[in-house]
Regions:
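Short, solvent-exposed loop/edge segments of extracellular or virion-exposed proteins
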Residues: 1-4
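Aromatic, loop-rich ligand-recognition surfaces of beta-strand-rich domains
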Residues: 6, 10-80, 91-144
Length: 144
């Protein structure tokens, strides 16, 4: 996935004043479909994802819905872990998305589906240029 702005390392620096933007051109339904693949470097028992919006950002530039997938080895098929919805303008804390059935994982894929609506809009039946920017991510090891 191409990067429009920011750097991937900004996703894991615990500062949501730094950010990463994928190279998409249309929102609120993202086009082209964009995803972020993360190689954790080792297998963990994946239990939860922490997601934090970029600070001081307009809500319509924040991700509303994303799909989460994971796999243990590079040659495995992706396991669908579900679609998740973020709360708009919540930038001070991570929003936590637990995995229903934690699994051994080395690779995580986040597919960005659509953004929050622009003020005054009530549904996703419009299109405009724009992007999504992500502040920070956390990957939690399941430990029970």
């Amino acid at each position: 996935l191409g990067t429009k702005e920011g750097d991937l390392k900004n996703l894991f620096d615990d500062k949501n004043s730094t950010f990463w933007c994928p190279d998409i051109t249309t929102r609120p339904i993202y086009d082209p479909v964009c995803y972020l693949d993360i190689d954790l470097g080792e297998v963990i028992k994946f239990g939860q994802l922490g997601y934090r919006h970029r600070s001081l950002n307009y809500s319509h530039l924040q991700c509303h819905t994303f799909k989460l997938e994971a796999k243990k080895t590079e040659s495995d098929a992706w396991t669908n872990l579900g679609e998740f919805v973020t709360e708009a303008l919540k930038v001070d804390d991570y929003q936590l998305f637990p995995i229903e059935e934690p699994l051994e994982t080395q690779y995580i894929r986040i597919t960005f589906i659509k953004g929050h609506l622009r003020d005054g809009k009530t549904d996703w039946n419009y299109s405009e240029t724009g992007n999504v920017s992500v502040g920070d991510l956390q990957v939690f090891v399941y430990n029970r």
